[in-house]
Amino acid sequence: MEIKDKVALVLGASKGIGFAIARTLAEEGAKVVLPYHSDWPEESDEMQKEFAGFGGNHLAIPVDLRDAVQVKDLIRQVQERFGALHILVNNIERGGMPVVHGSYDLEVNREQWDLEIDTTLKAKWLVVHNALPLMKNSSEGVIINVSSIAGFVGRSGPAGLIFNDGYAAANRAISSFTETWAREAAPTVRVNELMLGFFETRHAEGTRGWENLSGSEKESICKHTLLQSPGRLDDIVKAVFFLIKDARFMTGAVLRLDGGYVLGGEQVPVMPDGILNS
């Protein structure tokens, strides 16, 4: 799919991964819809200022994506403004960390479960449910569900310090949604999942949780990753653009971008003397 003049809805665009994706789409000539939440006022203000500087036809909309009525109105505004929707980057999540929040049954933590499930899972469903009819009527489309390896590894290994139970379960469900939506959206809309590991903008230096880990704990996460480091933001942007522009014959699939974390950091052992290595 060519990006120029296409309409793109990017969730989580006020900061981090979503902002980088939205900015690059705008630079490529897309008309970008930017939903934002009142929880992030400074980031949302900066986002709107930067996109105003790009020129072009972009739309920033305040919305709580966990609210069915507000999501329906969001898509209505997209249809009224642009008449089409071609690209949906379903990038919204809230994940608690055991090392930060502790158990769900702590008094200060009673709402954490609902926050993780409603934001990571319910909001994604609400947006696709409301956006898909418009996308199917827009000649061609692509949906990218951004998820986490938490759904694959759960609380195992060093990731057990980072991923809460509810967050991990919600991400496992996203893979099921991806397959279901791929069937519902075919043949005009492709639906794929981008499953992310540890990145400089996620659970790495300067982000919540990472500073609470000891040096040995940080080292164990990197050692558990075959490439022995967190990924970079531009790695994610490149993967998203591959799924939009080049993955013409790909739908219902999961593209895992984790530096080999899921494989456990275990390399092929050196064979004993006298046995040829491959």
Regions found by a protein language model. Name each.
Residues 28-46:
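Conserved glycine-rich Rossmann-like NAD(P)H-binding loop of the short-chain dehydrogenase/reductase
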Residues 2, 229-257, 262:
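C-terminal substrate-recognition "lid" of short-chain dehydrogenase/reductases
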Residues 94-97, 106-112, 136, 142-173, ...:
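Catalytic loop of short-chain dehydrogenase/reductase
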Residues 7, 14-15:
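Conserved glycine-rich cofactor-binding loop
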Residues 44-46, 102-103, 158, 198-224, ...:
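A glycine/serine/threonine-rich, flexible loop-to-helix segment
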